[in-house]
Regions:
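Pyridoxal 5′-phosphate
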Residues: 1-340
Length: 340
């Protein structure tokens, strides 16, 4: 990105040579993403992130029936709530893999149902890119959402796949960028950073590393949590057909998730209690409430996220600290334990 700021500083829409150089860099990233998801480059536009991409699709269907799942990101749930109506065709918006529990939704079945009725299907693929192979044509999607920071790129950059012929209404108007589909000056350094991350995915076939090394680490931690910590349970179904290989969400009876997070953070172990977009909200995770229906389970849950940079030593470090932390919290908890 530093190189891009120095070499591709010009407005990419300009006709002069520096502008052409900047646009070439943008198109390079577009082609990389298209190749990784089996799309045509002209079907992809760049945005400021997944939330903008999600809102763009849903606003296209303002006043129409919009059907989503309770597991969706807030940018889908809240936009759909504000903009849905009763007009047809219907938009179905279902993520492929949930960001809090990692589990897959039956996207192909939903797409088939949508298209049989002349409706449209959008999917937030943000969490899945780079973790598993993706093919928007095989998934039969009309729209798909991506975000650079989920693959090691910069924050503030995303992309939206729009199938040829699918309805589209720009969220931002006032410029001819992206063939009049998003009017604003290009964030060339950010898009270049996204491109560098995508090239890394392609060159290293990261989905293969996630399917082997990362899955092994995740499953080992899951096994040890259940074996060594009384009152623990998993909110993530394990298995290649069930969930992403890098996410593990677990609950610990009579231990508050935020307290677990703070104790682990003091030990240099970074976990989360839900979506980062909802951090600071004392309400239980809407995802875990939808899955379990139990506020105590939701409040006592934490999410572990693995990457190829992790090792079995990291699993050992977690298990050297976590049982003692849970035991300490359970002893001072006012919540009665169901298991002893």
């Amino acid at each position: 990105m530093r190189e891009a700021e120095q070499k591709f500083f010009a407005n990419a829409s300009a006709l002069h040579t520096p502008g052409h150089l900047a646009m070439n860099k943008i198109e390079e990233t577009r082609e990389l993403l298209a190749e990784l998801i089996n799309a045509d480059p002209e079907e992809i536009i760049f945005t400021s992130g997944a939330s903008e991409s999600n809102n763009t699709v849903i606003r296209t269907f303002e006043g129409h029936e919009i059907i989503t799942s309770p597991l969706e990101h807030h940018s889908v749930i809240e936009a759909a709530k504000a903009l849905k109506g009763k007009k047809k065709p219907t938009l179905y918006s279902y993520m492929f893999a949930n960001n809090e529990i990692g589990e897959f939704l039956p996207l192909k079945d939903i797409a088939k149902k949508a298209h049989e009725n002349g409706d449209f299907i959008h999917s937030d693929l943000t969490q899945a890119l780079g973790k598993i192979p993706l093919d928007v044509k095989a998934l039969d999607l009309d729209y798909a959402t991506f975000s650079a920071h989920k693959v090691g790129g910069p924050v503030g950059v995303g992309a939206l796949y729009i199938r040829k012929g699918a309805p589209f209404k720009p969220l931002i108007i006032g410029g001819n960028q992206e063939k009049h589909r998003r009017g604003t000056t290009y964030n060339t350094p950010g898009i270049a950073g996204f491109g560098a991350a995508l090239k890394y995915l392609k060159d290293h076939k990261t989905w293969e590393i996630y399917d082997t090394k990362v899955r092994e680490l995740r499953d080992e931690l899951a096994k040890r949590i259940l074996a060594e910590i009384p009152g623990s349970s998993l909110n993530t179904e394990l298995g290649r057909e069930k969930s992403l290989p890098n996410i593990l969400n677990a609950s610990f009876e009579a231990a508050e998730g935020e307290s677990i997070q703070l104790y682990l953070d003091a030990e240099g172990i970074v976990v989360s209690t839900g979506s980062a977009c909802a951090s600071g909200d004392i309400k239980p995770s809407h995802v875990l409430m939808a899955k379990t229906g139990d506020a105590e389970v939701a409040h006592s849950s934490i999410r572990f996220s693995f990457s190829p940079d992790n090792s079995m030593e990291d699993v050992e470090k977690v298990m050297a600290k976590l049982p003692g932390i849970i035991d300490r919290l359970q002893k001072i908890s006012t919540i009665e334990r169901k298991t002893k």
